[in-house]
Swiss-Prot record:
Assigned keywords, A-Z: Cytoplasm, Disulfide bond, Electron transport, Redox-active center, Transport
Annotated positions for site Deprotonates C-terminal active site Cys: D34
Domain of life per record: Eukaryota
GO cellular component: cytoplasm
Origin organism lineage: Eukaryota, Viridiplantae, Streptophyta, Embryophyta, Tracheophyta
PANTHER family: THIOREDOXIN, THIOREDOXIN H1
Protein's name according to its UniProt entry: Thioredoxin H-type
Record-annotated disulphide pairs: C40-C43
Record flagged with keyword Cytoplasm: yes
Pfam families: Thioredoxin
Role of this protein: Participates in various redox reactions through the reversible oxidation of the active center dithiol to a disulfide. The H form is known to activate a number of cytosolic enzymes.
Residues annotated as catalytic: C40, C43
Length: 118
């Protein structure tokens, strides 16, 4: 079972990750995945900003994956540094932002929301 963290859904097991990914794919909406780590300073810096975005954008699915907790998932998605944000639609990677870059994160979400099927 995934824990709700504001509107950012923390995936703490591979099962929860797969379940949330499937739910997001079923909605055909934008999924933003935050690959993070508890020891990562920039990750802690960007987390409140991500939570704010999640509150403002209820039609976007925000997921959070701790790379140390779900090493296999991080490896499958070729995550090399944190934070890494993946933008998915219907199971496909549409974009990626590496680093705690608020502006780039916001712009990338806006860009993909504009192309989202309604």
């Amino acid at each position: 079972m995934a824990a709700e963290e504001g509107q950012v859904i923390g995936c703490h097991t591979v099962e929860a990750w797969n379940e949330q990914l499937q739910k997001g794919n079923d909605t055909k909406g934008l999924i933003v995945v935050d690959f993070t780590a508890s020891w990562c300073g920039p990750c802690r810096f960007i987390a409140p900003f991500l939570a704010e975005l999640a509150k403002k954008l209820p039609n976007v699915t925000f997921l959070k994956v701790d790379v140390d907790e779900l090493k296999t998932v991080a490896h499958e998605w070729a995550v090399e540094s944190m934070p890494t944000f993946m933008f998915l639609k219907e199971g496909k990677i549409m974009d990626k932002v590496v680093g705690a870059k608020k502006d780039e994160l916001q712009q990338t979400i806006a860009k993909h929301m504009a192309t989202a099927s309604t």
